[in-house]
């Protein structure tokens, strides 16, 4: 497994790096990537941006808005949260078991004394 840690806080750069890793490694290698963004709203592939954000607030506060290549809901990022990406070689039958990606992270956090737990499909709550 490859491990990458992005030094960039630029959300466009980090999403491009994520896509580059996916395109270059493809089905050959697994990769775990850690990254942070400056103040950003990341919207899912199929979301209507204007329905997901308060454009006046976003402009007034200098918040960047970017779209990721995958689906899912809109999320807010800033330097107070750490994002992780798994690029995995194989999904059994095309089905993704998100808990298999979250479980090692939760286990590592618990070993450090952080009371983490998995909620829902892919949410880690602390």
PLM segments and residue spans:
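Active-site loop/lid in soluble adenylation, ligation, and acyl-transfer enzymes
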Residues: 1-52, 56
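Conserved small/polar residues in nucleotide/adenosyl-binding loops
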Residues: 124-126
């Amino acid at each position: 497994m490859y491990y990458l840690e992005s030094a960039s806080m630029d959300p466009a750069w980090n999403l491009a790096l994520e896509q580059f890793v996916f395109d270059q490694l493809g089905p050959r290698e697994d990769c775990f990537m850690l990254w942070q963004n400056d103040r950003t709203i990341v919207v899912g592939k199929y979301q209507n941006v204007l329905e997901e954000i308060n454009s006046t607030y976003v402009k007034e506060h200098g918040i960047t808005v970017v779209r990721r290549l995958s689906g899912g809901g809109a999320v807010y990022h800033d330097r107070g949260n750490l994002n992780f990406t798994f690029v995995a070689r194989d999904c059994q039958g095309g089905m993704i078991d998100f808990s298999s990606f979250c479980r090692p992270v939760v286990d590592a956090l618990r070993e450090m004394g952080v009371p983490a737990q998995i909620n829902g499909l892919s949410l880690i709550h602390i």
